[in-house]
Swiss-Prot record:
The gene is aroA. This is 3-phosphoshikimate 1-carboxyvinyltransferase. It catalyses: 3-phosphoshikimate + phosphoenolpyruvate = 5-O-(1-carboxyvinyl)-3-phosphoshikimate + phosphate. One of its GO terms (molecular function) is 3-phosphoshikimate 1-carboxyvinyltransferase activity. Catalyzes the transfer of the enolpyruvyl moiety of phosphoenolpyruvate (PEP) to the 5-hydroxyl of shikimate-3-phosphate (S3P) to produce enolpyruvyl shikimate-3-phosphate and inorganic phosphate. 3-phosphoshikimate binds at K22, S23, R27, S170, S171, Q172, S198, D313, N336, K340. Its EC number is 2.5.1.19. Belongs to the EPSP synthase family. Pathway: Metabolic intermediate biosynthesis; chorismate biosynthesis; chorismate from D-erythrose 4-phosphate and phosphoenolpyruvate: step 6/7. Monomer. Its main location: cytoplasm. GO terms for cellular component: cytoplasm. It comes from Aeromonas salmonicida (strain A449).
């Protein structure tokens, strides 16, 4: 296995232009494929998850043209649901943002589709989405374990009606159903069971759907009303915002040891993860907001005790930033860390302890108490891009850190370590 040793960084300073958002890129690609008209997407993320979505769209008969640097994509929309005459086998890697929305969208049309992925994908739940789709008339069979991929969709259309989506595990189940529902034969009412996690990701979905001509009403995120028999219409040009989750590593670095500006997102961003900057500010960092940038500057950091359900991906970065704060930090209401690319709660606790950190791992929380002196460690990354990027921040201390399998960042940020080096000054 490859590893990368990061030597201590004395200071960070500079500006980072963020790659496109993974969440926005894959949602926009799917809607562009279903829409009437041609859509030009700019600042598209070039990463594994996006490549899996593009490969699937090719198999589904969608024509598109990708620029040489793969950040601009012109999609010729089908103007209808997907339809194939022969069975199609889609390999979606570990891309939840492709697996869940495609599972729902494929039910709208006709044909037989097998959806599978990497071994970890077979451990990531999809049962709550499948249950809801079946209520709306979908024909879906599991191939191995009930409630998990791989699965087969025998598409015969969705009729809508009253459906129930459990919102307590992942917001992607609701996102997937919301994007499919306007093209169902009838109107749909989606009733949310349990507490809806990661609400800001639903706001991203609703915002992008609106850009493609579909407006959805909801009653305080408990009940969603969607008119059926609608069509998505291309907005023409669609700019993908910079990835706010990816911004978190550079903003944290600035808060810990210098001053860093990220561009491509700003105070009007549709992504909830920009509120990561508010957490840094509560910890003592100095934050400046612009229309197209966020800047974080070093301040004396202190621990916090916060519910971070609204920023689950960026909250991982707080767990490592906490090593540079005075006192303990508790991150709460993050059960859905356990159903991400790996069981992130267990993985973060395990790797933090290697550094000599006192960690309490609960069912849905983690408490981190920094030691007086960190220890050098080899960090295992569990094929999880965010673990690799989070733990790179340990190099802002007076010790080196070794990241195993650094290439796993290709899921969302292939040149992350180059970008980090560009704003880093060695000790």
């Amino acid at each position: 296995m490859n590893s990368l040793r990061l030597e201590p960084i004395s200071r960070v300073a500079g500006e980072v232009n963020l790659p496109g958002s993974k969440s926005v890129s894959n949602r926009a690609l799917l809607l562009a494929a279903l829409a009437r008209g041609t859509t030009r997407l700019t600042n598209l993320l070039d990463s594994d998850d996006i490549r899996h979505m593009l490969a699937a769209l090719t198999q589904l008969g969608v024509k598109y043209k990708l620029s040489a640097d793969k950040t601009e994509c012109t999609v010729h929309g089908l103007g209808r649901s997907f339809a194939v005459s022969a069975p199609v086998n889609l390999f979606l890697g570990n891309a939840g943002t492709a697996m869940r929305p495609l599972c729902a969208a494929l039910c709208l049309g006709s044909g037989e589709y097998m959806l599978g992925g990497e071994p970890r994908m077979e451990e990531r739940p999809i049962g709550h989405l499948v249950d809801a789709l079946r209520e709306a008339g979908a024909h879906i069979q599991y191939l191995k374990k009930d409630g998990y991929p791989p699965l087969v969709v025998d598409a015969k259309g969705l009729w809508g009606g009253d459906v129930h989506v459990d919102g307590s595990v992942s917001s992607q189940f609701l996102t997937a159903f919301l994007m499919a529902a306007p093209m169902a034969a009838g109107d749909t009412r989606i009733h949310i069971k349990g507490e809806l996690v990661s609400k800001p990701y639903i706001d991203i979905t609703l915002h992008i759907m609106k850009q493609f001509g579909v407006v959805i009403e909801h009653d305080n995120y408990k009940l969603f009303y969607i008119k059926g028999n609608q069509s998505y219409v291309s907005p023409g040009d669609f700019l993908v915002e910079g990835d706010a989750s990816s911004a978190s590593y550079f903003l944290a670095a600035g808060a810990i040891k210098g001053k860093v500006r990220v561009t491509g997102i700003g105070k009007h961003s549709i992504q909830g993860d920009i509120h990561f900057a508010d957490v840094l500010e509560r910890m003592g960092a100095r934050i400046t907001w612009g229309d197209d940038f966020i800047e974080a500057e070093q301040g004396p950091l202190h621990g916090v005790d916060m519910d971070m359900n609204h920023i689950p991906d960026a909250a991982m970065t707080i767990a490592v930033a906490a090593l540079f704060a005075e006192g303990p930090t508790s991150i709460r209401n993050i059960y859905n860390w356990r159903v991400k690319e790996t069981d992130r709660l267990h993985a973060m606790a395990t790797e933090l302890r290697k550094l000599g950190v006192e960690v309490e791992e609960g069912h849905d929380f983690i408490t981190v108490t920094p030691p007086t002196q960190l220890k050098h460690a080899e960090i295992d990354t569990y094929n999880d891009h965010r673990i690799a990027m989070c733990f790179s921040l340990v190099a802002l201390s007076d010790i080196a850190v070794t990241i195993n399998d650094p290439g796993c960042t290709s899921k969302t940020f292939p040149d992350y370590f180059d970008k980090l080096a560009s704003v880093s000054q060695a000790v």
